[in-house]
Amino acid sequence: MKDLKHLIYFESLLENADNELVKQAQAEGDICLGYTCYHVPEALLNIGNCFSVRLRAPKTGSIDIATYYMSNYTCEFARALVERGIEGGYQFLDAMIGVDACSMMNRAMEHFEVLKVNTKEKFFVTHMDIPFKVVDYTLDAYEIQMQKHVLDNLHEKFGIDTSDKAIRKAVKEHNEVCKILTEIGDMRKAENPVITGYEYHVLNLVSFTCPKRLILPYLKETLKEPVSYTHLRAHETSAH
């Protein structure tokens, strides 16, 4: 089985939270929004010239300082984020979008504020109350939370266009990324898969941690790759 053309590049993008594409987007004037939980509607964080980065803490060593602030009973992921934040590893963020879901992650986000891990003038941390039932009144509440805590903040602090047109554009781009990943994932169902589980995992991670507009061309190219591999394998089989 042949490795994907951009696999090494994708792996390099996962070595640091502020990877090459994040730096490129910010150099071009884009606003970087960090988040940690799937309860945050990712598409809304990619509205206008904003882009989302799902936070990780690669190359984490000791988390002793974060443990001092949070206690050793909190999960290691939450503490790793706080540790990296204290080290200055999230100075590249323009905002941190949190949700009131996991109490330990709430503690982590609170420490982002209390310890002032980011010194940018316009940096803010916001928390949203996420409903756990899907009924009409909770959906209405969810919409209000997104408007008040995300869209209004982005518009007021950074002048982001939060119109319905801008939202629909962000949703369209998000759906395109999801469609590509779904099609690539379906290739793993073949009798002789042309993509490994590891490769697919890497693709998923880069889609969460890189600006959508910059990673999308690489994902499109990757989608076409396994087709050529399939043709090559079929030719080799018939030759035998």
How would you label these PLM feature ranges?
Residues 1-164:
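Trp/Phe/Arg-rich N-terminal binding region typifying the photolyase-homology
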